């Protein structure tokens, strides 16, 4: 009887870890940046590279930062939803074009629509690294004080927009 106890105990422990892992949403990878100030950036605008956008320019408003690239297949999946959401919900959505060629990114926005208030260019990917980007697309919600409140990994889905992003944006807009 005792010889079966150890394998049974190991099996139960492994089953518990598996159950915990299966309950987690793969799009909700914990980020050490949640609740911390958004990393500062000063980047050229995609459409007008001689002009720049900084995090300081966005202080005092709730905004979304969508990290995307023209070479990103999943970005193409979420893009129509972002275009529609920007129109219907008047989102303050800023695009961080990640490790991309400017001409490719501009052509992509021309072909598929531009949901962004402004798109900025991170050709070297350094700002993406500061934000802890695993891959594109990723979307961040940043509050009026410049603090990251949420990170969406992967494409924004209609469910994520309806159930998470829009309620959080409304809540943050009401905050002082």
For each of these PLM feature ranges, what is it?
Residues 4, 110-115, 122-173:
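Thiol/disulfide oxidoreductase modules built on the thioredoxin-like
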Residues 70-77, 138:
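C-type cytochrome heme c attachment motif
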